[in-house]
Amino acid sequence: MIKVPAYMYVLECSDGTLYTGYTTDVKRRLNTHNTGKGAKYTRARLPVKLLYSEAFNSKQEAMRAEALFKQKTRQAKLTYIKQHKNEQ
């Protein structure tokens, strides 16, 4: 069986807030958000843009990373993104 990578992603909404989620296809999910068919949170804050995505070996790992990321303060999230973007 072929393993499909899963991704944690972070969006910046039109009001400047951040939204974090997970998916197996970042481009498709971003499009879903921007067409108003994504999460209720982003529907009211369109358009959204992708700030960051990180690949994981499984959906479970991506979900765990998402949960941990959501616990961070906004500043800690932005610092994480800045530090890890340089690694990609």
UniProtKB/Swiss-Prot annotation:
Residues 4-80 form the GIY-YIG domain. SUPFAM superfamilies: GIY-YIG endonuclease (SSF82771). InterPro entries: GIY-YIG_endonuc, GIY-YIG_endonuc_sf, UPF0213_domain. CDD domains: GIY-YIG_UPF0213. Pfam families: GIY-YIG. Belongs to the UPF0213 family. This is UPF0213 protein SAG0778. It comes from Streptococcus agalactiae serotype V (strain ATCC BAA-611 / 2603 V/R). The lineage of its organism: Bacteria, Bacillati, Bacillota, Bacilli, Lactobacillales.
